[in-house]
Amino acid sequence: MPINWSTSALLLVFAGACGKPDAAPATGQRPEVRDSTPSRPQPTRGETGARGLKRAPDSAAKGRGVKPPPDSAILIQLATQPKLRTKADSISLVSSIRTGLRNPGWPVKTPSLLPGSMLPAKRIVAFYGNPLSKKMGILGELPPDQMLGKFDSVVAQWRSADPSTPVQPALHLIVSVAQRLPGKDGMYRQRSDPGLIEKVYGWARSKGAITILDIQAGKSTIDSELPRLIPFLSRPDVHLGLDPEFYMHHNREGRIPATKIGAMDARDVNYAIDQLAALVTKYHLPPKVLIVHRFTTNMLQHASEIKLDPRVQVVINMDGWGQPWYKFDTYARCEAAEPVEYTGFKLFFHNDTRKGDPILSPREVLALRPRPMYIQYQ
């Protein structure tokens, strides 16, 4: 039932300031299948409590951040946040905000921004999926005209919610789609035809949007999948996404995508950063944006070793689905607790509303700290 969020927030933060450190989250999980290919865990409330958050490892923040704000600053910011829906949601949001505000790794000390850098001057708002599948995201769920009309509406909502930060629209296309079957080459992924990429790129251009090409590599590798995208990534308005959930390496060998959550190491991400940075230099492009999805800590290993390069702006995107409390907990544990550079937040039109919760509004997402600079709708 609805509660007065501001009053509860103040009480919870005072209690948190005097209480014990947060406990590590429990490990119990139950599977969810979001398509014939992808699956992911969705803990129950008892398995990961709202206070069940990991503190940021020293290595994650060392040398990257500044002194955390005093509790008084946290209280001031929390008192201005919107009302939420349930006590559980409010507890989790307060805990998530506190995690971000108290982590000395935020804000990350990034290299000096180059001309044309998109972040943090703009916030990217993206529709995600593949036009060949109605189950993988909004990009393929509706006919193009309807999808783009809804896209315009969502972008307008974000512009209204935060007028101080311009919105950069984006279409986020999965171009290597993980599969449960091996395929002819045994790599358990299907590559999109270049013609499909051009089609989505054309849709994006018609809306003044950028295009993000996403890799679900399966048993293939980033250094096998990325080179074929170079002709597209050489364009100034095309960027890259990596999905560790379907990267079956780093002790996932022998497992089929969607039967076990995959993982990437910082080395995999750094390879992509190097390739994108080289394109920026070679073709005199504005800096690229690299989106890396994450909803468990193990999905992205050695995150503190991801390099910072002014030619590539890295976003760690929270892409867990579920009720608001679960999404806030996941954001705290996987994004706010381990600073890399920028953060993102994913919203699911269907999976987030399965239990009757309305999808989180822009204003609710903007309550998080650090504020996500990339917003993705599936």
Model-flagged regions — what are they?
Residues 19-191, 304, 308-314, 325-378:
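Alpha/beta catalytic barrel-like cores
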Residues 131-133, 175-177, 217-219, 244-248, ...:
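Active-site-proximal loop/turn and secondary-structure-junction residues that shape catalytic pockets
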Residues 166-167, 205-210, 236-239, 284-289, ...:
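Loop/turn elements at helix/coil->beta-strand transitions in domains of secreted/extracellular proteins
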Residues 249-263, 317-319:
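Extended amphipathic alpha-helical segments with heptad-repeat/coiled-coil character used for oligomerization
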